């Protein structure tokens, strides 16, 4: 064997040895990374919601993402997708249940096709004030509904308050149930539509973005929604009368795919839970303040505001009792249970 052959052979073995070392090191590194992930290594979660970026709930989700990263020491991060960038409110829930989306903030009204018992929050005059809402959601009602979520492979991290539902119209002051007779009002779902009908008006189905023009053109006389939504959509420009009934409550759910939750380390789960609960408490205070602030803003913008006196609530309850009865009939024992939990919290 000549000297050139020997040199090439030595070079070949040196290169082969180096390549083998790199391969083994790579395998070792991959194994280590996998082990770290299983023990609570860096994980990114995707969080979607349809609300615009300037909405107070959207801002709360940004705070939530930041706190998760802080509390986990960077081992868990949350990437947010606001304003329907990733999923709309209609497609989001299926994505969460299938695992296509890790987390989503969505109205409980959008979950009612999956969990009909969530409609209880729209059953009129069950939860008269913010204290009763908090007591119900943090207590028996919340636990019962969270168990229903888990049956669908979903973990409800927190309930995020959106606010009370009121009535606005451009025809006349609504100071008693009889004043609703003959009006055409837009409702946002099954129970709100039943409530409108029980009060003697005709429910109309349409998207929230269509309401302003519909009132302006006379297609409808008014609508039911929260004052924050009324102010944001400038309903005060087309509707003169606002009736504060607090007859229903809009709640959002920060829901997570249960399998994804189970895949996290205990430390990551703790960071997620702690951040979520902190944000829940802040949202609760902000929502109550926003309700009061936007009600005053609507008044300043020219709307006549009538608040149903506590002494008159009983007659409004009586007028809409059929809605409660139908809800219980449609949902059986579970329906009766969640109604009872609301009534217990309101005492």
Predicted regions and their residues:
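Bacterial N-terminal signal peptides that target proteins for export
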Residues: 2-15
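N-terminal secretory/targeting leader peptides
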Residues: 2, 28-132, 141, 149-347
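Short beta-strand-centered segments that line the small-molecule binding cleft or hinge
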Residues: 135
